[in-house]
């Protein structure tokens, strides 16, 4: 798909997606209170995953790094540690999902990619919480270890499931709008009745999750 568009359009679209992802963080930062005092919930990884589904995992990583860097110097109080955490979180979710979708460019591939992305990102964040949170928060590691299952696991897994459901819900409408605006090349599968029925089922499942 990316081979059929100009580099200018690609850079423009990636910039737009990065700006939208940051706007999502900004809104969530002021509307959603932290969980357990420091765990922040946002859906920026939805936009980053969409960038990866359109352009590939490297583009998802680029958007993730840019968004995390801008977040660090504007609204985040976690500094370089938060920067690394946000990059790891976004890349483990969005890049893994995009890589699988790139290799299996079907609805099934997208679903599998998002599921694997949810699981891999959750696992990495649990390890991060166990290793880094005691240092960052200045609390005993045993205290953090006791929070892994009752606090960190449901929070992280729920966060990535939410992002995955939103990705499945809005990816197709966004891509369709971009193609109508001639910012993306048309796809021969857009008009396939079977694919439309599959997309309708995906929408219903995503809404149920939400």
Task: Please give the residue ranges for each predicted region.
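Loop-helix junctions at membrane interfaces
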Residues: 1-210
């Amino acid at each position: 798909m990316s081979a059929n568009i100009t580099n200018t359009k690609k850079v423009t679209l990636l910039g737009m997606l990065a700006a939208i992802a940051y706007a999502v963080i900004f809104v969530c930062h002021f509307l959603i209170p932290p969980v357990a005092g420091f765990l922040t919930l946002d859906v920026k990884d939805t936009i980053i995953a969409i960038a990866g589904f359109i352009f590939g995992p490297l583009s998802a990583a680029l958007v993730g790094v840019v968004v995390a860097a801008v977040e660090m110097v504007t609204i985040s109080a976690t500094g370089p540690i938060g920067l690394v955490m946000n990059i790891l979180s976004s890349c483990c979710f969005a890049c893994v999902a995009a890589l699988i979708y790139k290799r299996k460019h079907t609805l099934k591939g997208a679903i599998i990619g998002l599921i694997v992305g949810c699981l891999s990102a959750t696992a990495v964040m649990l390890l991060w919480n166990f290793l880094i949170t005691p240092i960052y928060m200045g609390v005993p590691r045993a205290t953090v270890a006791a929070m892994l299952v009752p606090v960190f696991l449901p929070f992280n897994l729920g966060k990535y499931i939410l992002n995955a459901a939103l990705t499945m819900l809005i990816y197709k409408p966004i891509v369709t709008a971009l193609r109508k605006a001639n910012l993306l090349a048309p796809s021969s599968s857009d008009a396939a009745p079977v694919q439309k029925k599959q997309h309708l089922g995906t929408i219903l499942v995503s809404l149920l999750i939400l």
